[in-house]
Amino acid sequence: MPPGKRPFNRRLFLAQGLLLAGAGAWTALSSSWYARFFRERIREFGRDIPLAPQRPDPTRWIDRDLTFSWLGHACILVNFKGLRILVDPTLYPRIGVNLGLGTLGPQRLMSPALLPMDLPDIDLVLVTHAHFDHLDAASLASIPGRPAAVMAHATSDLLPRKRYSSVRELRWNESAVIETPRGGVTVRAIEVKHWGARIRRDTWRGYAGFIVERDGRKLLFGGDTAETPLFAEHRRWGPFEAAFMPVGAYNPWIWNHCTPEQAVAMAQAAGAVHFVPLHHQTFRLSNEPFLEPIERTQAALAREPERLALSQIGQTVVLT
């Protein structure tokens, strides 16, 4: 045997083969969440991501209006009477853990309506909690301008702070006046029913919804939430011109996300005029069919269809 060459180890070879075969069988057949997660990642490999149905043009938005567009998942771009707000930005093809050579996590089912390079300079970024589908470090590092940031309690350590003019964490029922070059805005954190851990062990991280007020006009952002009577209590902070509520990832219920019907009911309890369904048509995070959340939302509002502000990624709404 040549010097330095290791002898062939038949037992090690067989053991490695059996281990790989077992892992493959487990991934293919197991009903566990982890096996389904890896099966989904394998299916995504090489899959094209379709373009969003609509593409907003913020350069044409009028500053005296209240205008917003759904960019995908929970990400909303708002022109709040001249002040640009971006909520829970996820603007890249995949979310999850950054491994250096790539990101391990779900791939988008639909492209964002706008990429970071397409955004106007942002004045304020809101982050409701630290879950990867709401707090995406790559997206937060790519926001144009030098915005202020308001985040849920104990989440700002995940933010690339050098890109931001100021960073403020809020606990439930705390509020702050955020001053920007385009004027001020009041942000209040509200309690919702969810959880904040990013990697399961950091259960101390906060989570919240937000109420945003400017010149007497108010918007309610529900973040992620399960069904809760809290939104009836939040009514006292209204009236709200629109409630931005999650309607997807409810099957199974253990993820603590409300159903579309529950989301509509909570927005009604809060007294919101318009309903904006979020958290669907973007990532496969649960078991319900792709279009089921919006179909159930439309059915829940069948008697008041004018209250449904939008249904497609990229759609733009103007509230004069």
Predicted regions and their residues:
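Active-site metal-binding loops of divalent metal-dependent hydrolases
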Residues: P89-L91, A130, V192-K193, G223-T225, ...
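Pre-active-site segment of Zn-dependent metallo-hydrolases
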Residues: P53-R60, F80-L126, A137-S142, G196-R198, ...
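C-terminal segment of N-terminal export signals and the immediately downstream linker at the start
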Residues: R6-P7, A28-W61, T67-S69
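Catalytic core of the metallo-beta-lactamase
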Residues: L71-N79, I178-E241, I254, E261
